[in-house]
Amino acid sequence: PVFSGVGGGLTQGARSSYMSLFAEAQGSLGVVLNGPTPLETVQEVCQVVDIPVISTVTSKYTEIDEKLEAGITIINISAGKETAETVKYFRERYPKLPIIATGGPTEESIRETIEAGANAITYTPPSNGELFSRKMEKYRKIEKNDQS
């Protein structure tokens, strides 16, 4: 994977550090810590890897200054329906900080998140099953129209 999740919620401390080292050794370009990661874990992970350490932000109320001082270099905003607003909030306060954000389910929400200041968007594409289902539905409509 490009980025590897290395804990922060249930998994903390040395275990997150070891996972970060393994991820780096396997070619990950960055490691991601969950929102509730304790500062001590952030510090440990930042000390053991040379790749970017990314911290997940879940709302505009998330405190990030100490984590930035510890070595976080990118934030990953995942604030549900408030993602664009949260991106805007952090972009205004940290104009040069790289921000990755979830874009939401529509082109409009993705565009809104980019316009709010996200540098990159994470997106989960439809599964093969979903794509196949859509294709089959089109075939059924064509057949139905041909019979009418």
Positions of PLM-derived features:
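Short beta-strand/loop segments at the ligand-binding rim of alpha/beta enzyme cores
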Residues: P1-G7, C46-S55, R91-T102
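Conserved N-terminal beta1-alpha1 strand-loop-helix module at the mouth
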Residues: P1-L29, I51, E107-E108, N128
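Catalytic beta/alpha-barrel core
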Residues: G5, S28-P38, P52-E63, T73-K81, ...
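Catalytic cores of alpha/beta
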Residues: R15-F22, T62-A70, P105-I121
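Generic structural signal for hydrophobic
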Residues: A23, V45-C46, E66-K67, F90, ...
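Short, structured coil segments at secondary-structure junctions
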Residues: Q26-G27, V48-V49, A70-G71, Y94-P95, ...
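Glycine-rich phosphate-binding active-site loops on the catalytic face of alpha/beta enzymes
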Residues: S28-P38, I77-T86, A116-M136
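C-terminal helical cap(s) of enzyme catalytic domains, especially alpha/beta-barrels
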Residues: E44-C46, I114, S127-S148
